[in-house]
Regions:
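A glycine-rich beta-to-alpha transition motif near the start of alpha/beta enzyme domains, typified by
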Residues: 1-112, 163-275
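N-terminal, positively charged, Ser/Thr/Ala/Gly-biased leader segments
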Residues: 1-22, 118, 135-156
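Membrane helix-loop-helix hairpins that form the core translocation module of multi-pass transporters
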Residues: 115-123
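Short, charged/polar, Gly/Pro-enriched secondary-structure boundary elements
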Residues: 124-128
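Short, conserved active-site entrance elements at the starts or edges of catalytic domains
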Residues: 132-139, 179, 184-185
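Selected transmembrane alpha-helices and immediately adjacent juxtamembrane segments
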Residues: 153, 161-164
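Active-site donor-nucleotide binding/catalytic segment of nucleotide-sugar enzymes
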Residues: 155-158, 263
Length: 275
């Protein structure tokens, strides 16, 4: 079986072309391949599949084998793969995901895709649709407690659940413990991705991400989108923000006229391999 290792700002994936390969047990396969000691090592597994409703279908599995509804970095990697490996000559693509169809425009340099602008769709803010257990419809600056410490979170779904927490200091947060406790907090029926954010200007912020089913990652596309939506809802930033993550920067814009979030960032091939 041939695979390709790719990443978006260090958020890395093993990509399999399911037009020619067959994966019998995707969750187990993801756990095996993504192990950084006994496998290839990655944050997740991406299966590039045929689709009856769009150009391609993306199936994503986290490193623990759980299903990811959407991935902003992963979808850019998929776009680079299908263009660079000749599965399409189109620069504008529609991709079927578990969270719906997403459209993206590839950025081409020297005949290769180097990144993409992705329409990440409508941010879901209703507590039930995220889901977050709450007596209120919107979860904005809402208290939550873990390890006898109180935080304020804003809940958003970008095709997967996010809890965004703003803080003046994020580098000293023990994310290995705090992130895990928050991910499995009883208020999140489907668990949650956690973002700790420090706003440095109306158009810039720094973010650390704890990804559901993975742990702390160098970047998270849906997390960056959720962070910007949350910062706008809390009147901390404008609608267009540069998000600095551990692995680099993403550009995010929440166009409130159409209520869609747009994400722009790079996609990089690391290597090909054979299993």
């Amino acid at each position: 079986m041939i695979f390709t290792k790719m990443h978006g700002l260090g958020n890395d994936y093993v990509c399999i072309n399911c037009f020619r390969e067959r994966v019998e047990d995707p969750p187990g396969f993801a756990r095996t391949l993504c192990d950084r000691h006994y496998g290839i090592g990655a944050d997740g597994l991406i299966l590039i599949c045929p689709s009856k409703v769009s150009d391609f279908k993306m199936e994503i599995y986290n490193s623990d084998g759980s299903v990811a509804g959407m991935c902003g970095n992963g979808i850019r990697c998929l776009g680079k793969y299908v263009y660079d490996y000749g599965l399409t000559g189109k620069e504008t693509l529609s991709i079927e995901t578990k969270s719906g169809i997403r459209n993206m425009h590839l950025q081409i340099r020297d005949g290769k895709a180097c990144g993409a602008m992705v329409d990440m769709g409508v941010p879901r803010l209703n507590a039930h649709s995220i889901p977050i257990l709450s007596e209120k419809d919107l979860v904005i600056n809402d208290p939550i407690e873990v390890q006898e410490k109180n935080y304020r979170m804003t809940g958003i779904s970008m095709g997967n659940p996010h809890a965004v927490i703003f803080s003046e200091e994020i580098n000293g947060i023990p994310l290995e413990e705090t992130g895990r406790e928050l991910e499995f907090h009883p208020r999140f029926p489907e668990r949650a991705n956690i973002e700790f954010c420090h706003v440095t200007a109306r158009n810039r912020m720094e973010v650390r991400v704890w990804e559901r089913g993975v742990g702390e990652t160098l970047a998270c596309g849906t997390g960056a989108c959720a962070a910007v939506v949350a910062s706008v809802l809390n009147d901390l930033t404008d609608e267009e923000v540069i998000v600095k993550l551990l692995g680099g920067e993403l550009s995010v814009r929440w166009d409130r006229k159409v209520n869609h979030v747009f994400l722009e960032g790079p996609a990089v091939k690391v290597f090909d391999g054979v299993l």
